[in-house]
């Protein structure tokens, strides 16, 4: 046993000692740091050592282990999250859940349900590699189907894992992807089935040619993020110009939050500029953006001090700098066409912070992923007690047989093709997905499908309102219906035709959903980015 593994087991033992009674945050963070620093097989060792403690008969040990698990998910990277999203781990996590919920859940069961609900609402929606976390969503549906009710999660807890994507350099994006691919490759080789080994072979080929094929995508992604920063800076400048001498700026207000955000972005812009060559087409644009941010922060400092004369002088310079960044960006439009097209489309629809829905360069699609659209509850429930490649003590609640073989029950309304379904919205009652049916160079036919996730409640009077950027044309066909019976999969569908796309690979959409459950009206709005590849 390696020294890192011995230290890991020792720390986990210390963190879950029954006499501790309360979690030791320092030890828990030490474990998370050890996982991040060591890598290799340690994330898997840690995940399964923790889940064994979760199943300890001593409730204090289980309580401490769940707190440790929560800390690790919040502080560890993709390699650890890949393990907690595996069937084997999830089956172990719910091993002590009976097939039907008891009249009263114990504290440990409630904590487990809370964690699964939190993961589903956060990392399964906003994580850069959320496609590899599909079994968490599937376990959530399975438990809901069996009658378990998930507790509400505090906004403070959701905020930790739902943070907007931060500005990263091309080098940081590449490093993050390489680490994620390495972790995924190791897991595929460990499982060792023929399908996994074939997938591992494909992934190794991708990794071998990654530098040349992906660098341009990283640069385009950085340019898109810088455009968001510029828009935020422009908004901040407009707000500062409207501040009068009677206004009072205070710590913690909106001005302070925007200033803090731009200060954080300023450091990243400096780093991006360092990685660029003066010969790069975007060098002048990034340099002007750096000057604009510095000037805006100076203006803000003058306003805080009550020096309105100096603030007005700086404001005049800011307008010139903003115009300069706009002009230099236009001059580079041909070079960064993909980046600017993506951003302009988003600008027509989405608010200032759209990072969580923007698609980053990501891992290649894997056959080991389980898309939400292929999950079938009825087929799953019929084989709950079937053979599962997990420890023999796995209880009545478990996901189905093969890691690589999702259960499927194709609806005639759902397209059977190689396109990826996008989950645009999901809550305890409704799942809303959009899937491309066919695509040409400038047109795509999309199918919106609606599924009732509740085992008890009927969704009534469902109405959807969908919009795309004004530069595209959208034709909406009528909905197939307005009501969804309990657990009815793809019970309502609607076809959409979008034209004037011109080789677009992602389509931003904005939507509004209204429906009734138990006589109560529900209304939700949101946005998503639909992959057209």
Curated annotation (Swiss-Prot):
Example GO molecular function: phosphatidylinositol binding
Keywords for this protein: Golgi apparatus, Phosphoprotein, Protein transport, Transport
Compartments where found: Golgi apparatus, trans-Golgi network
Superkingdom of source: Eukaryota
GO biological process per UniProt: Golgi to endosome transport; Golgi to vacuole transport; protein transport to vacuole involved in ubiquitin-dependent protein catabolic process via the multivesicular body sorting pathway
Domain GAE span(s) in chain numbering: 417-532
Xref: InterPro entries: ARF-binding, Clathrin_a/b/g-adaptin_app_Ig, Clathrin_app_Ig-like_sf, ENTH_VHS, GAE_dom, GAT_dom, GAT_sf, VHS_dom
Main localization category: Golgi
VHS domain: residues covered: 15-151
Pfam families the UniProt entry points to: Alpha_adaptinC2, GAT, VHS
Residues found modified as Phosphoserine: 320
Homology family: Belongs to the GGA protein family.
Name recorded for this polypeptide: Probable ADP-ribosylation factor-binding protein C25H2.16c
Organism per entry: Schizosaccharomyces pombe (strain 972 / ATCC 24843)
Lineage: Eukaryota, Fungi, Dikarya, Ascomycota, Taphrinomycotina
């Amino acid at each position: 046993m390696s020294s890192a593994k011995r230290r890991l087991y020792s720390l986990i033992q210390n963190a879950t000692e029954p006499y501790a009674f309360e979690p030791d945050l320092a030890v828990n963070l030490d474990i998370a740091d050890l996982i991040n620093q060591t890598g290799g097989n340690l994330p898997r060792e840690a995940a399964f050592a923790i889940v064994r403690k979760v199943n300890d008969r001593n409730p204090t040990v289980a309580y401490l282990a769940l707190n440790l698990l929560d800390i690790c998910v919040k502080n560890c990277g993709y390699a650890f999250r890949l393990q907690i999203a595996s069937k084997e781990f999830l089956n172990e996590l719910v091993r002590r859940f009976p097939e039907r919920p008891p009249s009263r859940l114990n504290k440990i069961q409630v904590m487990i349900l809370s964690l699964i609900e939190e993961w589903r609402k956060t990392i399964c929606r906003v994580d850069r590699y959320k496609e590899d976390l599909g079994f968490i969503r599937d376990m959530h549906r399975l438990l809901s189907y069996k009658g378990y009710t998930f507790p509400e999660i505090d906004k403070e807890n959701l905020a930790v894992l739902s943070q907007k994507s931060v500005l990263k350099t091309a080098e940081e994006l590449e490093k993050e992807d390489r680490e994620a691919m390495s972790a995924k490759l190791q897991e595929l080789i460990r499982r060792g089935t023929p399908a996994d080994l074939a997938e591992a072979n494909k992934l190794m080929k991708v990794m071998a040619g990654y530098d040349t094929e992906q660098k341009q995508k990283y640069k385009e992604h950085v340019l898109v993020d810088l455009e968001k920063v510029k828009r935020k800076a422009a908004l901040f400048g407009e707000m500062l110009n409207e501040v009068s001498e009677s206004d009072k700026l205070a710590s913690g207000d909106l001005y302070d939050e925007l200033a803090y955000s731009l200060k954080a972005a300023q450091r990243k812009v400096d780093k991006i500029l360092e990685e660029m060559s003066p010969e790069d087409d975007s060098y002048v644009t990034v340099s002007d953006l750096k000057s604009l941010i510095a000037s805006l922060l100076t203006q803000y400092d003058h306003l805080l001090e009550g020096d309105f004369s100096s603030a007005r002088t700086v404001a005049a310079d800011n307008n010139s700098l903003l115009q300069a960044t706009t002009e230099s960006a236009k001059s580079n439009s041909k070079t960064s066409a993909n980046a600017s097209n993506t951003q302009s489309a988003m600008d027509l629809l989405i608010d200032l912070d759209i990072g969580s829905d923007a698609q980053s360069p990501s891992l290649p699609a894997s056959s080991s992923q389980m898309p939400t659209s292929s999950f079938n509850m009825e087929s799953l429930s019929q084989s709950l007690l079937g053979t599962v490649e997990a420890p023999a003590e796995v209880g009545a609640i478990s996901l189905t047989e093969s890691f690589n073989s999702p259960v499927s029950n194709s609806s005639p309304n759902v397209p059977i093709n190689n396109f990826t379904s996008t989950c645009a919205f999901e809550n305890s009652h409704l799942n809303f997905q959009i899937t491309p049916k066919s695509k040409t160079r400038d047109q795509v036919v999309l199918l919106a499908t609606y599924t009732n996730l509740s085992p008890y409640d009927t969704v009534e009077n469902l109405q959807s309102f969908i919009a795309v950027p004004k530069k595209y044309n959208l034709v909406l066909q009528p909905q197939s219906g307005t009501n969804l019976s309990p657990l009815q999969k793809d019970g309502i569908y609607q076809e959409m035709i979008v034209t004037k796309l011109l080789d677009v690979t992602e389509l931003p959409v904005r939507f509004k959903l209204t429906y009734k459950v138990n006589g109560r009206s529900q209304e939700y709005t949101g946005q998503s980015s639909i992959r057209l590849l």
